Amino acid sequence: MNTVFNGKDFANKYYLMLKEFLKERNLRNKITLKVVLANDEPASKLYVSIKNRVAKEIGLNVEVIKLSANSVQSDILEVIDRENKNLSTDGIIVQLPLLKGMDLNSILNGIVSSKDVDGLSFVNLGKMILGDKKGFVPCTALAVLKILRDEGIKTSGKTVVVVGRSPLVGRPISILLSSKPHDATVIACHSKSIYLDVYLRQADIIISAVGKPKLIDKSMLCGKPYVIDIGISEIETDAGKILSGDTDFDNIKDCVKFITPVKGGIGPVTVLMLMFNTIKAHLINNNMFDVLDRLEKLVEV
């Protein structure tokens, strides 16, 4: 095994850089992110608390708008509409998953595109496809690009197998990596791909985001690829519940050049890119394009 990625150390380095960036430009505590939480799942509460802590550490204002678990879709849309009109709100995210029966697209597209810092609205996904840099790229996809760049993992001309096709993660990653300047040859697979092992053996880089525990083992690999594991699932063991990625980590770790673990892997970098997008939103909405240029050079993807 060559490298097990340390996402916490990676992200912490950039958190300090963003903190200094905001301080130097007198922007600390002048940028506001609103987080809408409408479920009682422990995992969602944990993710929100992490985003809240990181934002405050670097100097962003965060307000968590907690709705009742009995909330209906119109309650969330009402909050979104209010924050769309709130001039002091720079970014809005809705913590997923939504409650059963809610229309994900209606809620995500309720957020005005200039404040959609998760980058999941139709407008921002369209801008991503067209290469419009004023749009917001989904944070996990952006995190993948950041890891590849900073770790010196070349994509141009390489074969990248992306396992997962969700519009939130897998599909944006496939589109971005096949576009300039990344120029990869992307093979898009999913949990129903019959010949997944055949495709994986062709891969220079594997990116998996399907949420199926231990889907990928060493029998499916060839030539020590780079692996970014985005999937996360709970599995039962004799010792109780544990987290698992899409890869069988212990099984493949000696058969790869690079791998991201489930804990402390892609997660901290995804939060980092949410902070980046939130600062970017403030700068664009206030026509601070010279400062935006410096930000993009600081956190280059």
Curated annotation (Swiss-Prot):
Q: Write down the SUPFAM superfamilies for this protein, in alphabetical order.
A: Aminoacid dehydrogenase-like, N-terminal domain, NAD(P)-binding Rossmann-fold domains
Look up the domain of life of the source: Bacteria
Q: Where is the signal peptide?
A: none
Identify the HAMAP family for this entry.
THF_DHG_CYH
Self-association state and partner proteins as the record states: Homodimer.
Q: Name one GO molecular function term.
A: methylenetetrahydrofolate dehydrogenase (NADP+) activity
Function, in words: Catalyzes the oxidation of 5,10-methylenetetrahydrofolate to 5,10-methenyltetrahydrofolate and then the hydrolysis of 5,10-methenyltetrahydrofolate to 10-formyltetrahydrofolate.
- InterPro entries recorded for this chain? Aminoacid_DH-like_N_sf, NAD(P)-bd_dom_sf, THF_DH/CycHdrlase, THF_DH/CycHdrlase_cat_dom, THF_DH/CycHdrlase_NAD-bd_dom
Naming one, the record's GO cellular component terms include: cytosol
Look up and give the organism this protein is from. Answer: Borreliella afzelii (strain PKo) (Borrelia afzelii)
Q: Which UniProt keywords apply?
A: Amino-acid biosynthesis, Histidine biosynthesis, Hydrolase, Methionine biosynthesis, Multifunctional enzyme, NADP, One-carbon metabolism, Oxidoreductase, Purine biosynthesis
State what protein this is by name: Bifunctional protein FolD
As recorded in UniProt, its EC number(s) are 1.5.1.5, 3.5.4.9
Q: Give the binding site residues for NADP(+).
A: 164-166, 191, 232
Q: Which reaction does it catalyse?
A: (6R)-5,10-methylene-5,6,7,8-tetrahydrofolate + NADP(+) = (6R)-5,10-methenyltetrahydrofolate + NADPH; (6R)-5,10-methenyltetrahydrofolate + H2O = (6R)-10-formyltetrahydrofolate + H(+)
Pfam families for the chain? THF_DHG_CYH, THF_DHG_CYH_C
Q: Which pathway does the protein contribute to?
A: One-carbon metabolism; tetrahydrofolate interconversion
- Which biological process terms from the Gene Ontology are attached to this UniProt entry? L-histidine biosynthetic process; methionine biosynthetic process; purine nucleotide biosynthetic process; tetrahydrofolate interconversion
Q: Which family does it belong to?
A: Belongs to the tetrahydrofolate dehydrogenase/cyclohydrolase family.
